[in-house]
Amino acid sequence: MSICTSYDIELWKIIQQETIRQEEHIELIASENYVSTQVMKAQGSQLTNKYAEGYPGKRYYGGCEYVDMIEQLGINRAKELFSADYANIQPHSGSQANFSVYNALLHPGDTILSMHLNHGGHLTHGSQVNFSGKLYNAVFYGVDENGCINYEKVHHLAVKHRPKMIVGGFSAYSGIINWSNLRQIADAVQAYLFIDMAHITGLVAAGIYPNPLPHAHVVTATTHKTLAGPRGGLILASGGNDALYKKLDASVFPGSQGGPLMHVIAAKAIALKEAMDPSFKVYQQKIVQNAKIMVKEFALREFKIISGMTHNHLFLLDLRDKNITGKDASTALERANIIVNKNSIPNDFRSPFITSGIRIGTPAITRRNFNENDVRKLSHWICDILNHIDNNEIIFSIKNKVLRICSQYPIYNKSY
């Protein structure tokens, strides 16, 4: 970075501003986290120079001896960590991984059955604005009045629509999905079961959340979010189906990507190694504990939580009773240096740009070593702002508290 400082002052200043923003803000976006300095070093290494189309031992370019070793190391670690016998670590993102799975197993026009975006699903699970909703016929299941998946309804929809694939996984669901139930439903209609565990990758790696690998035909993951690695995707499978694995590999390259990002693959390999350390399990346990603490404190302050609980790293606040939109809530909180994202809630009548809820996640604050007392205080600061959304004095007072607590927990323990 020192070279960048002198060569491109304009860019460096902006990077420094973002560094300061991260240090001085409390991050509660469930999909964001902080990577280690080891991950950053790998991602900024000379590996960015190397083209390596293909797979280890089967490249279309020469000079791949060492990048082959790096990619194979990452593959082996992914297999070990998730008890898989197949791993593709080339996808540039979770969405790229999902596209590759669909492309490998489906034809345009095939039916998929997945969780509705407004009920906690993801854009790539069949949303009409996404490739998955444009290429495939998406039918959706959702959550019941208690905020939980009703598997009998999922089974009914599967029997009625006979999907080629059932998609499990979420971006905003605080429960534990019963993978076995979904597999039984998929088998009943001879469908593939595809699980997108992007949000819970770290929790699964640590054994905190049930591993979908024994139940799914194929699983995708991201290496950021709860895994706390670089931004990127994984495809995993078990069961020894070599024909399936060949389809998946071909769908990634050459089906949807060219040369893999070897500097990112090296960073993924480091993150996977970090996830094997016993301290990582402690970290993941604390993520869930902190989320549960926040839910309890919000409930004490009479805020409505979708499903009333959480068993993972996130939860949704339903703000309709407070007559606040998600957009207004996130804007007010950001003025106090608290970052959340507005989020649709089940049966939300507001647009995705406004929403009736916010999503809160604890991976980043836990990574930053916030303790239980800090998490309780933070919960009440959020409640105070949401109860006085136009009170500048309260917001400014809480911002000062946020700045003080952030200074106690620097992200990278260095000056800027």
Swiss-Prot record:
Record the organism. Answer: Blochmanniella pennsylvanica (strain BPEN)
Q: Which residues bind (6S)-5,6,7,8-tetrahydrofolate?
A: L117, G121, H122, L123, S351, P352, F353
> What Gene Ontology cellular-component terms does the record carry?
cytosol
CDD domains in alphabetical order? SHMT
The GO annotation for biological process reads: glycine biosynthetic process from serine; tetrahydrofolate interconversion
Q: What is this protein called?
A: Serine hydroxymethyltransferase
N6-(pyridoxal phosphate)lysine found at? K225
Catalytic reaction list = (6R)-5,10-methylene-5,6,7,8-tetrahydrofolate + glycine + H2O = (6S)-5,6,7,8-tetrahydrofolate + L-serine
Q: Where is this site: Plays an important role in substrate specificity?
A: H224
